Amino acid sequence: MGLPWYRVHTVVLNDPGRLLSVHIMHTALVAGWAGSMALYELAVFDPSDPVLDPMWRQGMFVIPFMTRLGITNSWGGWNITGGTITNPGLWSYEGVAGAHIVFSGLCFLAAIWHWVYWDLEIFCDERTGKPSLDLPKIFGIHLFLSGVACFGFGAFHVTGLYGPGIWVSDPYGLTGKVQPVNPAWGVEGFDPFVPGGIASHHIAAGTLGILAGLFHLSVRPPQRLYKGLRMGNIETVLSSSIAAVFFAAFVVAGTMWYGSATTPIELFGPTRYQWDQGYFQQEIYRRVSAGLAENQSLSEAWSKIPEKLAFYDYIGNNPAKGGLFRAGSMDNGDGIAVGWLGHPVFRNKEGRELFVRRMPTFFETFPVVLVDGDGIVRADVPFRRAESKYSVEQVGVTVEFYGGELNGVSYSDPATVKKYARRAQLGEIFELDRATLKSDGVFRSSPRGWFTFGHASFALLFFFGHIWHGARTLFRDVFAGIDPDLDAQVEFGAFQKLGDPTTKRQAV
Protein backbone atom coordinates (compact mmCIF):
# COMPACT_ATOMS: atom_id res chain seq x y z
CA MET A 1 0.00 0.00 0.00
CA GLY A 2 3.01 2.26 0.56
CA LEU A 3 1.57 4.28 3.43
CA PRO A 4 3.82 6.79 5.21
CA TRP A 5 4.49 5.89 8.86
CA TYR A 6 2.10 8.53 10.20
CA ARG A 7 -0.84 7.13 8.19
CA VAL A 8 -0.50 3.41 8.88
CA HIS A 9 -3.59 3.33 11.12
CA THR A 10 -5.81 3.87 8.08
CA VAL A 11 -5.56 0.10 7.46
CA VAL A 12 -8.08 -0.46 10.28
CA LEU A 13 -10.34 2.48 9.38
CA ASN A 14 -13.10 0.41 7.77
CA ASP A 15 -12.10 -2.97 9.22
CA PRO A 16 -13.85 -3.56 12.59
CA GLY A 17 -12.32 -7.02 13.05
CA ARG A 18 -8.75 -5.83 12.77
CA LEU A 19 -9.53 -2.65 14.71
CA LEU A 20 -10.54 -4.95 17.58
CA SER A 21 -7.39 -7.03 17.02
CA VAL A 22 -4.96 -4.12 17.35
CA HIS A 23 -6.71 -2.93 20.52
CA ILE A 24 -6.41 -6.40 22.07
CA MET A 25 -2.73 -6.43 21.11
CA HIS A 26 -2.29 -3.03 22.75
CA THR A 27 -3.82 -4.43 25.95
CA ALA A 28 -1.41 -7.38 25.70
CA LEU A 29 1.56 -5.01 25.50
CA VAL A 30 0.39 -2.90 28.44
CA ALA A 31 -0.34 -5.91 30.67
CA GLY A 32 2.90 -7.61 29.60
CA TRP A 33 4.93 -4.52 30.44
CA ALA A 34 3.24 -4.20 33.85
CA GLY A 35 3.90 -7.84 34.76
CA SER A 36 7.48 -7.82 33.47
CA MET A 37 8.29 -4.53 35.19
CA ALA A 38 6.89 -5.89 38.45
CA LEU A 39 9.11 -8.99 38.23
CA TYR A 40 12.17 -6.83 37.45
CA GLU A 41 11.46 -4.54 40.41
CA LEU A 42 10.97 -7.53 42.71
CA ALA A 43 14.33 -8.90 41.54
CA VAL A 44 16.18 -5.71 42.54
CA PHE A 45 14.04 -4.59 45.52
CA ASP A 46 15.54 -4.80 49.02
CA PRO A 47 12.70 -5.11 51.59
CA SER A 48 15.01 -5.22 54.63
CA ASP A 49 14.62 -1.60 55.81
CA PRO A 50 11.16 -0.12 55.17
CA VAL A 51 11.99 2.96 57.30
CA LEU A 52 15.27 4.27 55.84
CA ASP A 53 15.25 2.43 52.49
CA PRO A 54 11.58 2.26 51.45
CA MET A 55 10.35 1.41 47.95
CA TRP A 56 10.32 5.04 46.79
CA ARG A 57 13.97 5.57 47.80
CA GLN A 58 14.86 2.52 45.68
CA GLY A 59 13.04 3.89 42.63
CA MET A 60 10.26 1.33 42.56
CA PHE A 61 7.47 2.39 40.19
CA VAL A 62 4.87 -0.40 39.96
CA ILE A 63 5.30 -1.89 43.45
CA PRO A 64 3.72 1.21 45.10
CA PHE A 65 0.64 0.87 42.89
CA MET A 66 0.20 -2.79 43.78
CA THR A 67 0.71 -1.98 47.47
CA ARG A 68 -1.89 0.80 47.58
CA LEU A 69 -4.46 -1.68 46.22
CA GLY A 70 -3.80 -4.16 49.02
CA ILE A 71 -0.84 -6.34 47.98
CA THR A 72 1.72 -6.53 50.80
CA ASN A 73 3.22 -10.05 50.73
CA SER A 74 5.86 -11.71 48.58
CA TRP A 75 6.54 -15.34 47.72
CA GLY A 76 10.06 -14.53 48.92
CA GLY A 77 8.72 -14.65 52.48
CA TRP A 78 8.78 -10.91 53.22
CA ASN A 79 6.12 -8.34 53.94
CA ILE A 80 6.29 -4.74 52.73
CA THR A 81 6.20 -3.45 56.32
CA GLY A 82 9.39 -5.36 57.15
CA GLY A 83 8.00 -8.54 58.72
CA THR A 84 8.32 -12.15 57.58
CA ILE A 85 5.42 -14.34 56.45
CA THR A 86 4.88 -18.04 55.84
CA ASN A 87 1.79 -18.09 53.61
CA PRO A 88 1.69 -15.18 51.16
CA GLY A 89 -1.19 -16.68 49.17
CA LEU A 90 -1.91 -16.36 45.45
CA TRP A 91 -2.31 -12.58 45.41
CA SER A 92 1.24 -11.70 46.32
CA TYR A 93 3.44 -9.33 44.31
CA GLU A 94 4.66 -12.24 42.20
CA GLY A 95 1.11 -13.58 41.84
CA VAL A 96 -0.16 -10.27 40.48
CA ALA A 97 2.83 -9.99 38.13
CA GLY A 98 2.25 -13.53 36.88
CA ALA A 99 -1.47 -12.89 36.36
CA HIS A 100 -0.63 -9.88 34.18
CA ILE A 101 1.82 -11.91 32.10
CA VAL A 102 -0.68 -14.77 31.62
CA PHE A 103 -3.39 -12.26 30.69
CA SER A 104 -0.96 -10.63 28.26
CA GLY A 105 -0.32 -13.98 26.57
CA LEU A 106 -4.03 -14.70 26.22
CA CYS A 107 -4.61 -11.23 24.75
CA PHE A 108 -1.73 -11.81 22.33
CA LEU A 109 -3.38 -15.02 21.08
CA ALA A 110 -6.79 -13.34 20.88
CA ALA A 111 -5.28 -10.48 18.86
CA ILE A 112 -3.80 -12.93 16.35
CA TRP A 113 -7.13 -14.78 16.09
CA HIS A 114 -9.05 -11.59 15.41
CA TRP A 115 -6.45 -10.47 12.86
CA VAL A 116 -6.82 -13.74 10.92
CA TYR A 117 -10.60 -14.03 11.34
CA TRP A 118 -11.44 -10.39 10.74
CA ASP A 119 -14.50 -10.80 8.52
CA LEU A 120 -17.01 -11.84 11.18
CA GLU A 121 -20.76 -11.75 10.67
CA ILE A 122 -21.23 -9.67 13.83
CA PHE A 123 -19.44 -6.74 12.14
CA CYS A 124 -21.70 -6.71 9.06
CA ASP A 125 -24.69 -4.44 8.64
CA GLU A 126 -27.50 -6.81 7.62
CA ARG A 127 -29.11 -4.06 5.52
CA THR A 128 -26.06 -3.33 3.36
CA GLY A 129 -23.86 -6.38 3.86
CA LYS A 130 -20.89 -4.09 4.49
CA PRO A 131 -18.74 -3.90 7.63
CA SER A 132 -20.29 -1.47 10.08
CA LEU A 133 -20.22 -0.66 13.78
CA ASP A 134 -23.13 0.74 15.78
CA LEU A 135 -20.95 3.23 17.65
CA PRO A 136 -23.62 4.73 19.98
CA LYS A 137 -24.58 1.20 21.06
CA ILE A 138 -20.93 0.25 21.63
CA PHE A 139 -20.52 3.44 23.67
CA GLY A 140 -23.46 2.36 25.85
CA ILE A 141 -21.99 -1.12 26.36
CA HIS A 142 -18.58 0.25 27.36
CA LEU A 143 -20.11 2.84 29.67
CA PHE A 144 -22.22 0.18 31.38
CA LEU A 145 -19.32 -2.25 31.84
CA SER A 146 -16.90 0.41 33.10
CA GLY A 147 -19.66 1.57 35.47
CA VAL A 148 -20.01 -1.97 36.84
CA ALA A 149 -16.22 -2.21 37.34
CA CYS A 150 -16.08 1.22 38.99
CA PHE A 151 -19.01 0.44 41.31
CA GLY A 152 -17.59 -2.98 42.15
CA PHE A 153 -14.19 -1.54 43.02
CA GLY A 154 -15.68 1.08 45.34
CA ALA A 155 -18.36 -1.09 46.93
CA PHE A 156 -16.38 -4.32 47.36
CA HIS A 157 -12.59 -3.94 47.02
CA VAL A 158 -12.11 -0.61 48.83
CA THR A 159 -14.66 -1.30 51.58
CA GLY A 160 -13.25 -4.77 52.28
CA LEU A 161 -16.65 -6.36 51.62
CA TYR A 162 -14.94 -8.60 49.06
CA GLY A 163 -11.30 -7.59 48.92
CA PRO A 164 -8.45 -6.35 51.10
CA GLY A 165 -9.24 -2.63 51.25
CA ILE A 166 -6.58 -0.05 50.36
CA TRP A 167 -3.46 1.49 51.89
CA VAL A 168 -4.43 3.97 54.62
CA SER A 169 -2.04 6.02 56.72
CA ASP A 170 -1.90 8.94 59.15
CA PRO A 171 -1.11 12.49 57.93
CA TYR A 172 2.61 12.00 58.65
CA GLY A 173 3.03 8.65 56.88
CA LEU A 174 4.02 6.65 59.97
CA THR A 175 1.31 4.03 60.57
CA GLY A 176 0.32 2.97 57.06
CA LYS A 177 -1.28 -0.39 56.42
CA VAL A 178 -3.89 -2.02 54.18
CA GLN A 179 -7.36 -1.84 55.69
CA PRO A 180 -11.03 -1.63 54.66
CA VAL A 181 -12.40 1.89 54.18
CA ASN A 182 -15.96 3.02 54.83
CA PRO A 183 -17.48 5.35 52.21
CA ALA A 184 -17.56 9.03 53.22
CA TRP A 185 -20.93 10.38 52.09
CA GLY A 186 -20.67 13.77 53.80
CA VAL A 187 -18.80 16.85 52.68
CA GLU A 188 -15.58 15.29 54.06
CA GLY A 189 -15.68 12.90 51.09
CA PHE A 190 -14.58 15.79 48.87
CA ASP A 191 -11.36 16.23 50.86
CA PRO A 192 -8.67 14.67 48.64
CA PHE A 193 -6.84 13.37 51.73
CA VAL A 194 -9.84 11.43 53.12
CA PRO A 195 -9.65 7.75 52.02
CA GLY A 196 -13.43 7.33 52.44
CA GLY A 197 -13.91 9.59 49.44
CA ILE A 198 -12.26 6.95 47.23
CA ALA A 199 -14.97 4.43 48.13
CA SER A 200 -17.92 6.85 47.91
CA HIS A 201 -16.79 8.45 44.65
CA HIS A 202 -16.29 5.08 42.95
CA ILE A 203 -19.72 3.93 44.10
CA ALA A 204 -21.34 7.18 42.93
CA ALA A 205 -19.45 7.36 39.62
CA GLY A 206 -20.09 3.66 38.98
CA THR A 207 -23.82 4.07 39.58
CA LEU A 208 -23.88 7.04 37.21
CA GLY A 209 -21.95 5.04 34.61
CA ILE A 210 -24.36 2.10 34.85
CA LEU A 211 -27.40 4.38 34.45
CA ALA A 212 -25.77 6.33 31.61
CA GLY A 213 -24.81 3.08 29.89
CA LEU A 214 -28.37 1.76 30.08
CA PHE A 215 -29.62 5.11 28.74
CA HIS A 216 -27.33 4.97 25.72
CA LEU A 217 -28.29 1.35 25.09
CA SER A 218 -32.02 2.10 25.11
CA VAL A 219 -32.19 5.59 23.55
CA ARG A 220 -30.95 6.37 20.05
CA PRO A 221 -29.29 9.77 19.46
CA PRO A 222 -31.37 12.34 17.52
CA GLN A 223 -30.47 12.54 13.84
CA ARG A 224 -29.23 16.15 14.00
CA LEU A 225 -27.00 15.36 17.01
CA TYR A 226 -25.77 12.15 15.34
CA LYS A 227 -24.73 14.06 12.23
CA GLY A 228 -23.54 17.17 14.08
CA LEU A 229 -21.13 15.24 16.32
CA ARG A 230 -20.22 12.81 13.50
CA MET A 231 -21.30 9.84 15.63
CA GLY A 232 -20.99 7.46 12.68
CA ASN A 233 -17.27 8.18 12.24
CA ILE A 234 -14.72 6.05 14.08
CA GLU A 235 -12.40 9.08 14.32
CA THR A 236 -14.99 10.69 16.59
CA VAL A 237 -14.51 7.75 18.95
CA LEU A 238 -10.74 8.22 18.76
CA SER A 239 -11.02 11.94 19.51
CA SER A 240 -13.35 11.56 22.50
CA SER A 241 -11.33 8.63 23.88
CA ILE A 242 -8.15 10.71 23.73
CA ALA A 243 -10.04 13.48 25.57
CA ALA A 244 -10.97 11.06 28.38
CA VAL A 245 -7.38 9.83 28.63
CA PHE A 246 -5.70 13.26 28.68
CA PHE A 247 -8.20 14.55 31.23
CA ALA A 248 -7.49 11.57 33.49
CA ALA A 249 -3.73 12.05 33.01
CA PHE A 250 -3.94 15.71 34.06
CA VAL A 251 -5.99 14.77 37.14
CA VAL A 252 -3.62 12.05 38.33
CA ALA A 253 -0.58 14.26 37.65
CA GLY A 254 -2.16 16.74 40.08
CA THR A 255 -3.11 14.22 42.76
CA MET A 256 0.39 12.73 42.58
CA TRP A 257 2.37 15.99 42.71
CA TYR A 258 0.26 17.78 45.32
CA GLY A 259 -0.54 14.60 47.26
CA SER A 260 -3.82 12.88 48.10
CA ALA A 261 -5.21 9.79 49.81
CA THR A 262 -4.53 7.88 46.56
CA THR A 263 -0.79 8.66 46.67
CA PRO A 264 0.41 7.89 50.25
CA ILE A 265 3.86 9.24 51.13
CA GLU A 266 4.92 5.84 52.50
CA LEU A 267 4.59 4.40 48.99
CA PHE A 268 5.55 7.32 46.73
CA GLY A 269 7.63 9.54 49.03
CA PRO A 270 6.79 12.99 50.42
CA THR A 271 5.71 15.92 48.25
CA ARG A 272 7.85 19.02 47.67
CA TYR A 273 5.30 21.17 49.48
CA GLN A 274 5.87 19.26 52.70
CA TRP A 275 9.48 20.48 52.59
CA ASP A 276 8.52 24.00 51.49
CA GLN A 277 6.04 24.39 54.35
CA GLY A 278 8.17 22.71 57.01
CA TYR A 279 5.37 20.17 57.45
CA PHE A 280 7.38 17.44 59.17
CA GLN A 281 9.62 19.93 60.99
CA GLN A 282 6.56 21.47 62.67
CA GLU A 283 5.29 18.05 63.76
CA ILE A 284 8.72 17.11 65.14
CA TYR A 285 8.94 20.36 67.14
CA ARG A 286 5.37 19.84 68.37
CA ARG A 287 6.28 16.38 69.67
CA VAL A 288 9.47 17.65 71.31
CA SER A 289 7.56 20.51 72.96
CA ALA A 290 4.97 18.04 74.24
CA GLY A 291 7.77 15.90 75.68
CA LEU A 292 9.37 18.88 77.40
CA ALA A 293 5.97 19.80 78.86
CA GLU A 294 5.92 16.33 80.43
CA ASN A 295 9.23 17.11 82.18
CA GLN A 296 11.35 15.08 79.77
CA SER A 297 14.88 16.26 79.06
CA LEU A 298 15.78 17.52 75.56
CA SER A 299 17.66 14.29 75.00
CA GLU A 300 14.66 12.15 76.02
CA ALA A 301 12.20 14.21 73.97
CA TRP A 302 14.31 14.01 70.81
CA SER A 303 15.04 10.30 71.34
CA LYS A 304 11.29 9.60 71.12
CA ILE A 305 11.02 11.10 67.62
CA PRO A 306 10.45 8.20 65.16
CA GLU A 307 13.35 7.79 62.74
CA LYS A 308 10.78 7.54 59.95
CA LEU A 309 9.40 11.01 60.76
CA ALA A 310 12.90 12.51 60.96
CA PHE A 311 13.77 10.95 57.58
CA TYR A 312 10.82 12.64 55.87
CA ASP A 313 12.27 15.96 57.13
CA TYR A 314 15.33 15.68 54.88
CA ILE A 315 15.63 17.59 51.59
CA GLY A 316 17.05 14.55 49.78
CA ASN A 317 13.54 13.05 49.87
CA ASN A 318 12.01 16.09 48.16
CA PRO A 319 10.91 14.98 44.64
CA ALA A 320 11.59 18.48 43.24
CA LYS A 321 15.33 18.16 44.08
CA GLY A 322 15.86 15.79 41.17
CA GLY A 323 17.09 17.25 37.88
CA LEU A 324 16.41 16.73 34.19
CA PHE A 325 18.37 13.73 32.83
CA ARG A 326 19.33 12.55 36.34
CA ALA A 327 18.41 8.92 35.84
CA GLY A 328 18.22 6.43 38.68
CA SER A 329 16.73 6.09 42.12
CA MET A 330 17.20 8.39 45.10
CA ASP A 331 19.61 5.81 46.53
CA ASN A 332 21.81 6.33 43.44
CA GLY A 333 21.97 10.02 44.29
CA ASP A 334 22.76 10.83 47.90
CA GLY A 335 23.17 7.18 48.90
CA ILE A 336 21.38 4.64 51.09
CA ALA A 337 20.35 6.09 54.44
CA VAL A 338 21.95 4.12 57.27
CA GLY A 339 20.93 6.01 60.40
CA TRP A 340 19.81 9.28 61.93
CA LEU A 341 22.71 11.12 63.58
CA GLY A 342 20.34 13.12 65.78
CA HIS A 343 19.08 16.70 65.90
CA PRO A 344 21.85 19.33 66.06
CA VAL A 345 21.29 22.30 68.38
CA PHE A 346 23.68 25.21 67.76
CA ARG A 347 24.53 27.78 70.44
CA ASN A 348 26.78 30.83 70.52
CA LYS A 349 29.13 31.62 73.41
CA GLU A 350 26.34 33.47 75.26
CA GLY A 351 24.33 30.23 75.23
CA ARG A 352 21.70 31.58 72.80
CA GLU A 353 20.15 28.81 70.66
CA LEU A 354 20.68 29.30 66.92
CA PHE A 355 18.79 27.79 63.99
CA VAL A 356 20.29 27.04 60.58
CA ARG A 357 18.26 28.57 57.74
CA ARG A 358 17.14 25.70 55.53
CA MET A 359 17.81 25.44 51.82
CA PRO A 360 14.78 26.24 49.61
CA THR A 361 13.75 23.59 47.10
CA PHE A 362 15.13 25.14 43.92
CA PHE A 363 18.62 26.01 45.23
CA GLU A 364 21.65 23.83 44.62
CA THR A 365 23.83 25.95 46.91
CA PHE A 366 22.75 28.24 49.73
CA PRO A 367 24.62 30.41 52.24
CA VAL A 368 25.00 28.91 55.72
CA VAL A 369 23.19 31.37 57.99
CA LEU A 370 22.34 30.82 61.68
CA VAL A 371 19.56 32.95 63.19
CA ASP A 372 18.17 33.23 66.70
CA GLY A 373 14.57 32.69 67.78
CA ASP A 374 13.65 36.19 66.56
CA GLY A 375 15.08 35.61 63.08
CA ILE A 376 18.10 37.86 63.66
CA VAL A 377 21.31 36.65 61.99
CA ARG A 378 23.83 35.71 64.70
CA ALA A 379 26.35 33.55 62.82
CA ASP A 380 27.28 32.40 59.33
CA VAL A 381 29.93 30.73 57.22
CA PRO A 382 31.25 33.79 55.33
CA PHE A 383 32.17 33.94 51.64
CA ARG A 384 34.98 36.43 52.41
CA ARG A 385 36.78 35.87 55.68
CA ALA A 386 38.34 39.35 55.67
CA GLU A 387 34.94 41.04 55.93
CA SER A 388 33.27 38.54 58.25
CA LYS A 389 31.53 39.61 61.45
CA TYR A 390 29.49 36.54 62.27
CA SER A 391 31.81 33.64 61.45
CA VAL A 392 31.57 30.48 63.55
CA GLU A 393 35.05 31.23 64.90
CA GLN A 394 34.20 34.83 65.86
CA VAL A 395 30.84 34.04 67.44
CA GLY A 396 32.06 30.85 69.13
CA VAL A 397 29.33 28.50 67.90
CA THR A 398 29.05 24.99 69.35
CA VAL A 399 26.78 22.12 68.38
CA GLU A 400 25.18 19.42 70.53
CA PHE A 401 23.17 16.46 69.28
CA TYR A 402 19.92 15.18 70.80
CA GLY A 403 18.42 11.83 69.79
CA GLY A 404 19.87 9.59 67.09
CA GLU A 405 23.32 8.01 67.00
CA LEU A 406 25.18 11.09 68.35
CA ASN A 407 22.79 11.68 71.27
CA GLY A 408 24.58 13.75 73.93
CA VAL A 409 27.68 14.40 71.81
CA SER A 410 28.81 18.03 71.45
CA TYR A 411 31.47 19.71 69.28
CA SER A 412 33.18 23.09 69.64
CA ASP A 413 35.81 22.67 66.92
CA PRO A 414 34.85 25.31 64.25
CA ALA A 415 35.52 22.97 61.29
CA THR A 416 33.23 20.28 62.73
CA VAL A 417 30.55 22.82 63.70
CA LYS A 418 30.57 24.25 60.15
CA LYS A 419 30.33 20.74 58.68
CA TYR A 420 27.15 20.01 60.64
CA ALA A 421 25.75 23.51 59.98
CA ARG A 422 26.05 22.85 56.25
CA ARG A 423 24.32 19.50 56.64
CA ALA A 424 21.59 21.03 58.83
CA GLN A 425 20.63 23.19 55.83
CA LEU A 426 19.28 19.99 54.31
CA GLY A 427 17.03 19.13 57.25
CA GLU A 428 17.64 16.33 59.72
CA ILE A 429 21.13 14.83 59.44
CA PHE A 430 21.54 11.23 58.29
CA GLU A 431 24.48 8.93 57.73
CA LEU A 432 24.38 7.93 54.05
CA ASP A 433 26.14 4.98 52.41
CA ARG A 434 27.37 6.15 49.00
CA ALA A 435 29.81 3.29 48.45
CA THR A 436 27.41 0.35 47.92
CA LEU A 437 25.70 1.75 44.81
CA LYS A 438 28.55 4.12 43.84
CA SER A 439 26.13 6.99 44.47
CA ASP A 440 27.31 10.29 43.01
CA GLY A 441 25.96 12.63 45.70
CA VAL A 442 23.60 14.46 43.33
CA PHE A 443 19.94 14.41 44.39
CA ARG A 444 17.43 12.36 42.38
CA SER A 445 13.66 12.62 42.16
CA SER A 446 11.30 10.00 43.56
CA PRO A 447 8.71 8.00 41.56
CA ARG A 448 6.29 10.79 42.53
CA GLY A 449 8.28 13.17 40.34
CA TRP A 450 8.64 10.73 37.43
CA PHE A 451 4.94 9.85 37.43
CA THR A 452 3.93 13.52 37.46
CA PHE A 453 6.35 14.50 34.70
CA GLY A 454 5.35 11.56 32.51
CA HIS A 455 1.61 12.02 32.90
CA ALA A 456 1.67 15.82 32.53
CA SER A 457 3.80 15.50 29.37
CA PHE A 458 1.61 12.85 27.78
CA ALA A 459 -1.55 14.69 28.82
CA LEU A 460 -0.34 17.76 26.92
CA LEU A 461 0.54 15.60 23.91
CA PHE A 462 -2.84 13.86 24.03
CA PHE A 463 -4.61 17.21 24.39
CA PHE A 464 -3.22 18.21 20.99
CA GLY A 465 -4.15 14.75 19.68
CA HIS A 466 -7.75 15.34 20.78
CA ILE A 467 -7.84 18.73 19.02
CA TRP A 468 -6.28 17.22 15.89
CA HIS A 469 -8.59 14.24 15.54
CA GLY A 470 -11.65 16.20 16.71
CA ALA A 471 -11.03 18.79 14.00
CA ARG A 472 -10.46 16.06 11.40
CA THR A 473 -13.77 14.36 12.15
CA LEU A 474 -15.83 17.55 12.52
CA PHE A 475 -14.44 19.18 9.37
CA ARG A 476 -13.86 16.03 7.37
CA ASP A 477 -15.90 17.25 4.40
CA VAL A 478 -14.01 20.56 4.31
CA PHE A 479 -10.58 18.90 4.49
CA ALA A 480 -11.53 16.33 1.85
CA GLY A 481 -13.07 18.95 -0.45
CA ILE A 482 -16.40 17.12 -0.35
CA ASP A 483 -19.49 19.31 -0.16
CA PRO A 484 -23.01 17.95 0.47
CA ASP A 485 -24.23 19.86 -2.63
CA LEU A 486 -21.34 18.72 -4.79
CA ASP A 487 -23.47 16.55 -7.07
CA ALA A 488 -25.44 19.58 -8.25
CA GLN A 489 -22.31 21.65 -8.80
CA VAL A 490 -20.45 19.13 -10.95
CA GLU A 491 -23.37 18.71 -13.37
CA PHE A 492 -22.40 20.68 -16.49
CA GLY A 493 -24.49 23.79 -16.89
CA ALA A 494 -26.25 23.53 -13.50
CA PHE A 495 -25.53 27.21 -12.81
CA GLN A 496 -25.48 30.19 -15.16
CA LYS A 497 -22.33 31.30 -13.34
CA LEU A 498 -19.94 28.48 -12.41
CA GLY A 499 -20.03 27.68 -8.67
CA ASP A 500 -22.64 30.34 -7.83
CA PRO A 501 -25.68 28.53 -6.33
CA THR A 502 -27.79 31.73 -6.63
CA THR A 503 -27.75 31.45 -10.46
CA LYS A 504 -29.30 28.00 -10.74
CA ARG A 505 -30.75 27.36 -14.21
CA GLN A 506 -34.48 26.77 -14.43
CA ALA A 507 -35.69 23.69 -16.22
CA VAL A 508 -37.51 24.63 -19.47
UniProtKB/Swiss-Prot annotation:
Write down what this protein is called: Photosystem II CP47 reaction center protein
Query: Where's it found, cell-wise?
Result: Plastid, Chloroplast thylakoid membrane
Q: Name one GO cellular component term.
A: chloroplast thylakoid membrane
Q: Listed GO molecular functions?
A: chlorophyll binding; electron transporter, transferring electrons within the cyclic electron transport pathway of photosynthesis activity
Cofactor comment: Binds multiple chlorophylls. PSII binds additional chlorophylls, carotenoids and specific lipids.
Role this protein plays: One of the components of the core complex of photosystem II (PSII). It binds chlorophyll and helps catalyze the primary light-induced photochemical processes of PSII. PSII is a light-driven water:plastoquinone oxidoreductase, using light energy to abstract electrons from H(2)O, generating O(2) and a proton gradient subsequently used for ATP formation.
- What's its membrane topology? Multi-pass membrane protein
